[in-house]
Amino acid sequence: MVADLNRCVGCQTCTAACKHTNATPPGVQWRKVLDVEMGEYPNVERLFMPVGCQHCSDPPCMEVCPSTATGQRKDGIVTIDYDICIGCSYCAVACPYQARYKVETPRFAYGEQPTETEALRFDEGRIGVAQKCTFCSDRVDAGLARGLKPGVDPDATPACANACIANALTFGDLEDPDSNVSKLLTDNTWFRMHEELGTEPGFFYLWNEK
């Protein structure tokens, strides 16, 4: 995924779309937007930075998982098998991006009972185990099965990218040189979070420093 920080307006529509799609409980944001100050006075700039699981090529969360619940697909998406996860939270400690959550008891937006929308998407298997952004892998897989192209067809693209009003989030195949994400990285200046850690994130940021 590529986030264009030159375009992001900090509206957090991506956060809302993610919460609606995945029915994450209060306090859990698989996709959130940071309000960041860059530079030093008087040359200060403000930017908004979408963050979440970086779907690293060398994920430290997977390395420390004692139950092998954390895995990685061939397309690079880092996954969690809720049936195998023992809830030790080693992965949450190892993640340098603070992208993992653990919810011990069911929580809902308005009281003890879920709303109609929450009830449709509530997954009891996520209680007491690690959870995080999945890049809407179920949606991606369903789209691929129908011959759709992730990052091009909305029904094969993560909810956050579909919802972005500024077209700041772009999803696609990094191994395809003709994909939308590959072209963005070729034509623009980009960086990744905590490159120095060697995790090789699959989430890229475009930023033209003024």
Task: Give residue spans per PLM region.
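Non-ligating segments of multi-cofactor redox enzymes
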Residues: 1-210
